[in-house]
């Protein structure tokens, strides 16, 4: 057994980094893992979009001025090779997708923007994305079963999932939503052009804005409370479950925070 373990260790060391498949002790069947790397130049104002189904997405600021993406695929009952990572370059930037096998007859495609949803059935492969962005690049992260998190970005952020938390930190502005999870966001700018929205169904919302924020504000919950650090000029009837009013001068912009089962907290940055 010791000799076999040594042989296995040497084999793993000599394997290319891109693909490693092995039989994991304590698990039934094969566990496979595979990595995908991409990097490229992206200018200020361009968008890097990540689309996944199962797995987490994490984005942070790049230290070398280049955009970099590491996608790590994990398979248990299904081979990680069954999920393809596709890169689509377009006029607005780059979209990178985890493309699962299709079972409905309509092939899954990697399309920029909202596009058509992918159909996935009975495939347990998860793909975790680790992203590094140059300053000023817009980030879009979309998944279904997983968390979307950004750390100290400097561009606009849009983050969406279904089953997972949203955690956003950017010196710009952002918006995001989930269904089963909480939303936590810290924004360094309130100069969004029209409106931004953060929403969930089963989870709380905590949003931090600059002290000088100026916006129309609306917050709504069913089972929870609403609190704000900002002085608020209330419009209409004041309710513990629904608040509509103005922060600062309003600025011609809108901010909507909405949940069903959870509380809402609007914080003022110090």
Language model: regions and residue ranges:
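Intrinsically disordered, low-complexity terminal regions
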Residues: 1-270
């Amino acid at each position: 057994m010791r000799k076999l373990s040594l042989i296995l260790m040497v084999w793993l060391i000599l394997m290319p980094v891109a693909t490693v498949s092995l039989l994991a002790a304590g698990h039934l069947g094969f566990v496979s893992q595979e990595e995908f790397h991409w990097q490229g130049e992206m200018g200020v104002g361009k968008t890097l979009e990540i689309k996944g189904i199962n797995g987490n997405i994490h984005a942070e600021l790049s230290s070398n001025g280049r955009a970099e993406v590491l996608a790590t695929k994990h398979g248990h009952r299904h081979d990680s090779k069954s999920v393809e990572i596709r890169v689509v370059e377009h006029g607005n930037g780059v979209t990178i997708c985890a493309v699962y096998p299709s079972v409905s007859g309509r092939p899954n495609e990697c399309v920029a923007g909202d596009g058509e949803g992918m159909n996935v059935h009975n495939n347990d492969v998860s793909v975790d994305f680790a992203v590094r962005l140059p300053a000023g690049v817009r980030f879009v992260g979309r998944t279904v079963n997983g968390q979307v998190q950004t750390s100290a970005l400097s561009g606009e952020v849009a983050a969406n999932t279904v089953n997972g938390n949203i955690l956003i930190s950017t010196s710009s502005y952002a918006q995001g939503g989930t269904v089963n999870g909480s939303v936590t966001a810290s924004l360094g700018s309130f100069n969004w052009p029209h409106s931004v929205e953060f929403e969930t169904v089963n989870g709380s919302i905590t949003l931090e804005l600059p002290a000088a924020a100026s916006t129309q504000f609306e917050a709504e919950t069913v089972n929870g409370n609403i609190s704000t650090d900002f002085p608020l000029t209330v419009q209409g009837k004041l309710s513990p479950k629904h608040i509509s009013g103005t922060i600062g001068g309003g600025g011609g912009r809108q901010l909507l925070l909405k949940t069903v089962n959870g509380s809402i907290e609007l914080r003022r940055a110090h």
